[in-house]
Amino acid sequence: MSNITPQEIKKEFLKSKMGIAGIVILTILILTSIITMIIIPIETFQEWNNPESWITYPKAAIPIWVNLFLTEKIPEHKILAEPNIETMFNDEINLTSYQFNVNFNYDQFPKDFIYSYLLEYSGSPLIQVSVIRPDGVKLELVSTSLPHSDLKTIHSDRMFSTDAMIKKELVLQEEKFEFEINELSVEDIVFSKTESNKPLKGNYVFLVDFYEINEESKIIDSKLIIGGKAFGIMGTDELRRDLAIGLLWGTPLALFIGLAVSIGSVVMGLVYGIYAGFKGKKTDETMMRFNDVLYALPALPFLIILSVTISNSIFVMTGFLMIFGWVGIAKVARSMSLQIKTRGYVEAATIMGQKDSKMILKHILPQLLPYAFASIAISVPAAITTEAGLSFLGLGDPSFPTWGQILHDANTFGAAARGLWWWIVPPGIMIAITGLAFVFIGNALDSIINPKLKR
């Protein structure tokens, strides 16, 4: 091992293009993690496996930017939660009207549409839903009364385009079309041209009228969902979850797992190896035989057994990875410790009666720190890929949206066979990029502290 100061390491590292590239990638990952934890609501993390939280999202939707490369535009999924509101209260009528403007410029019909509302009322309000199309044709969709209540009650409901009463209402307006509509779906009828069954592009206005709403009643929530086939910058999975959120939350989780395992393993191995090499004789022999036993154990089968029998918690898994990750570090640290303790200044300190702990901390440990930092950087990718592998096998913590867990879900629902590439490729790329950052940094440090590796 060469004697090299921290200043020299820094100077040489800044000359390394590989090291600089690794630092740039790592900085981007750290900034992504910080922004994710600050901006994205923590509820999206906590509710990742709660289907109710994602019910308004589309199922297995492609990313919206794919439309840039398609001649036939795919309809985007739209969640409209801020309608224009008009109210009218007089002796003749009490009306609250919600207007949802939908700009539809796609070459395919939407999958469906849903109107959901939450209403506090008394009496028996009447709800009428209609749509004014770009060609000026107005279609009545549904007219229904809510259950009568003398007391204030809170009522929530959803109206689906698949409801039979909506299809029945549209069939009664068949004269507005020049072709047969009986066999068509509701969304195909609503978004179709009058002369042919092709999408009608333009601005649609969905009107939701609440009649007999008194001044004491109030509409708490009103939302229109146009079910599209494209959503977000990363699309959605079969469980309707926004994959962009999963990928972003996976970044701090990957860094936590990788750094926690690598730092823990290196510290354990460093302390163990230095102490064994410094003490020597029977202590060294006993400690290294125990190290050999652990080194010979097949790590993956044991990790599988431990995760099944004890716990698949991400924190417990991190501990398991530390247990199997320090043995190789200990062997190298022990060999370095044996070399350093034979040097004159260490022998002089021994003759002067310095304590073992002081000699280790003052004379041996500082010389192993460059190796320790390089080992930490190089060990991170292994920890991340091991966690991803265990999660892919179904042995990870399902409550955390790690990249490995996303790949596991993709495999479970046959994403590869179904061509859902956006569910598979991005998490794989993120794992590769994160690993590459630490490999670049580790190799740059390794070439500095081991000059023989330089080319």
Protein language model annotation of sequence segments:
Residues 236-455:
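Alpha-helical transmembrane segments of integral membrane proteins
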Residues 1-258, 410-428, 432-433, 446-455:
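Gly/Trp-centered helix-boundary motif
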